[in-house]
From Swiss-Prot:
Its cofactor is Mg(2+); Mn(2+). PANTHER family: PROTEIN ADENYLYLTRANSFERASE SELO, MITOCHONDRIAL. This is Protein nucleotidyltransferase YdiU. It comes from Burkholderia mallei (strain ATCC 23344). Keywords: ATP-binding, Magnesium, Manganese, Metal-binding, Nucleotide-binding, Nucleotidyltransferase, Transferase. Its EC number is 2.7.7.-, 2.7.7.108.
């Protein structure tokens, strides 16, 4: 059968939302008990509508992308139907504690997020969480709502980070509403459907350690090992092995952040994933003009979470996790006394934490070597990379474009230097460095074209710059969601040229320098 231009093909039937709802099931975390979670329905969100949707995240969950058009989709993924769910099936908020800006903050918890269950697909299970679904027992002074602005930023950055190859939570959808909420100004509400294999944070362990609840602490550790670190079960000390794996993943994650110029903004221990995922997208930012001291969070007046500080803070956060796990480390070994076990546990934990620099450093060096197009490893490579970063810092050269344009530099002469050279104020400094770089490239067997292709596979052309997100947000506030979709599509192919979208890779406009992001959302 064929259709003429004047005839429309019959529309495919929309997915059955009831089937999706039926597939949701209680996840293993809530089975840990009432000490871990509180069940409650989401707060009603009036007249919800779809702002953004990720086909890719839907497929990861085994869902049809056409689900977004199914009747009731926006209602379900803002949590409205949960008011009618039986008590035993209600969503839940989890409790945790943590250090915020280096200070013990005590009990925190999911103050505006509810986990509605999990979906299984391709041998993996994914938890679905609604961020902005209303007040919980852990909301403190908050209203439990997320705003459209921050929800769009989280949705877009979740997509961007995933397609950059950086471990991250995902975002299935953003649901908006005209319901007003008060922040620094009047804004409107939104809910993000976040997806991850687990939302367990360092702060979950800190909570039960600080409250002297060893049984719950052990149950939590056993849950994480059983579900996500099964190899740790066979280790001589499973809990020490858990610390080692979480520390390694954290070190490697932050190395990936540094390699793309990503600043998280709020690296509190309650924002650190036990799985080594980027989690809790708040006042984040990708660096434009490079500044190693760059602080993306306007609320971070002391610069604790500056770009250059992220590795040190991640290491410190792992110490906090280690402290929380100390009561468990060594339980599988015979010890003459509890004091002896505890003393040995401290020694073993310090040994694990001492490996962080040797995990982070080589991971970052490998990433930077690839960004420079160096297939061979040479003793002076780290110094060459550091010299580049120093002159980038001095000239405030654009981070993303500098590395992307380096692919045009030839090992033979300076004819390809102009695009990257023009990013530097001190061009003599760049010329001196470029001569060193060319000399290093002469030791490589690859020709310029092969090297450039390899570099363009690791140096993105497109990242989520703040002004791009701001443009999409401004249009979304006028009920035009096309820019959210367009920008998300570009960010799903960050390494491709996409010449029709060159404007998204351009240097930021002057007005972008006035943008500020903070913890206000």
């Amino acid at each position: 059968m064929s259709f003429s231009r004047s005839e429309a093909a019959p529309a495919a039937p929309l997915p059955d939302l009831a089937a999706t709802l039926a597939a949701l099931r209680d996840d293993a975390f809530q089975q840990l008990g009432a000490a871990f979670v509180t069940r409650l329905p989401a707060a009603p969100l009036p007249a919800p509508y779809v702002v953004g949707f990720s086909d890719d995240a839907a497929r990861m969950l085994g869902l049809e992308p056409a689900l977004r058009d199914a009747p009731g989709f926006a209602e379900l993924f803002c949590g409205n139907p949960t008011r009618d769910w039986p008590q035993a099936s209600l969503p839940y908020a989890s409790v945790y504690s943590g250090h915020q800006f280096g200070v013990w903050a005590g009990q925190l918890g999911d103050g505006r997020a509810l986990t509605i269950g999990e979906l299984a697909h391709d041998g993996r299970r994914y938890e679905l969480q609604l961020k902005g679904a209303g007040r919980t027992p852990y909301s403190r002074m908050g209203d439990g709502r997320a705003v459209l602005r921050s929800s769009i930023r989280e949705f877009l950055c979740s997509e961007a980070m995933h397609h950059l190859g950086i471990p991250t939570t995902r975002a299935l959808a953003v649901i908006g509403s005209d319901q007003p909420v008060v922040r620094e100004e009047i804004e409107t509400s939104a809910v993000v459907t976040r997806v991850a294999q687990s939302f367990v944070r360092f702060g979950h362990f800190e909570h039960f350690f600080a409250n002297d609840r060893p049984e719950q602490l052990r149950a939590l550790a056993d849950h994480v090992i059983e579900r996500f670190y099964p190899a740790c079960r066979d280790a001589d000390d499973p809990y020490l092995a858990l610390l080692a794996e979480a520390t390694r993943r954290t070190a490697e994650l932050v190395a990936q952040w540094q390699a793309v110029g990503f600043c998280h903004g709020v690296m509190n221990t309650d924002n650190m994933s036990i799985l080594g995922l980027t989690i809790d997208y708040g006042p984040f930012g990708f660096i434009d003009a490079f500044d190693a001291k760059h602080v993306c969070n306007h609320s971070d007046t002391q610069g604790r979470y500056a770009y250059r500080m992220q590795p040190r803070i991640a290491h410190w956060n792992c110490f906090c996790l280690a402290q929380a796990l100390l009561p468990l480390i060594g339980l599988h070994r015979d010890a003459p006394s509890e004091d002896a076990r505890a003393e040995r546990a401290v020694e073993d934990a310090h040994a694990v934490l001492g490996r962080f620099p040797e995990q982070f450093g080589p991971a970052l060096e490998r990433a930077i070597r690839a960004k420079l197009g160096l297939a061979l490893e040479r003793e002076g490579d780290a110094a060459l990379a550091n010299q580049l970063l120093e002159i980038m810092d001095a000239s405030h050269a654009d981070f993303t474009l500098t590395f992307r344009h380096l692919a045009r530099v030839s090992k033979h002469d300076a004819r390809g230097d102009a695009p990257v050279r023009d990013l530097f104020i001190d061009r003599d400094a760049f010329d001196r460095w470029a001569n060193l770089y060319r000399a290093r490239l002469s030791e490589e067997a690859r020709d310029d074209a092969s090297r450039a292709a390899a570099m363009n596979r690791v140096n993105p052309k497109y990242v989520l710059r703040n002004h791009l997100a701001e443009t999409a947000i401004r249009r979304a506030k006028e009920k035009d969601f096309s820019e959210v979709e367009r920008l998300a599509a570009v960010l799903r192919r960050p390494f491709d040229e996409q010449p029709e979208h060159d404007a998204y890779a351009a240097l930021p406009p002057d007005w972008a320098s006035t943008l500020e992001v903070s913890c206000s959302s």
